[in-house]
């Protein structure tokens, strides 16, 4: 996986939370929602059908593990999981914890409200959640500060 390069959109909007065996996990820097993306670190993939059978199974197992964890950590009402890629062609799977009182409920979040970046303290706390969480085959990003 040495040829993997993160798409500039994901680099710009994401904050590294950690890594699974296959996927990099980013927090989208929008404090309106607990919004994460899993990005399989495989070059030149834009859709799940580009993955091998084993990679495909691994991605959805990582998605299941991560989804369970974030619903518990953020006490959500609903978990939205989607792989769109219309604007950012690199394969990435959104995991968005939704609340009945969130700014866009019940509609999709895209384009509803301007992104509101997390404060450094908020980012630190979210990283600490994942440092202490025990997710199978997950390595949390180093939490500085």
Regions found by a protein language model. Name each.
Residues 1-91, 95-145:
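HIT superfamily nucleotide-processing domains
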């Amino acid at each position: 996986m040495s040829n993997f390069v993160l798409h500039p959109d994901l680099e710009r909007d994401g904050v590294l939370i950690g890594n699974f065996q296959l996927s990099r996990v980013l927090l989208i820097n929008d404090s309106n929602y607990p919004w994460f993306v899993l990005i399989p670190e495989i070059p030149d993939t834009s859709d799940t059908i580009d993955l091998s059978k084993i990679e495909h199974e691994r991605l959805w197992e990582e998605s299941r593990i991560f989804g369970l964890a974030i619903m518990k950590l953020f006490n959500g009402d609903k978990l939205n999981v989607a792989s769109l890629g219309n604007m950012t062609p690199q394969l990435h799977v959104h995991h968005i914890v939704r609340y009945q009182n969130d700014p866009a409920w019940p509609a999709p979040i895209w384009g509803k409200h301007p992104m509101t970046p997390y404060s450094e303290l908020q980012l630190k706390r979210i990283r600490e959640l994942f440092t202490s969480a025990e997710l199978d085959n997950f390595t949390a990003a180093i939490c500085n500060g």
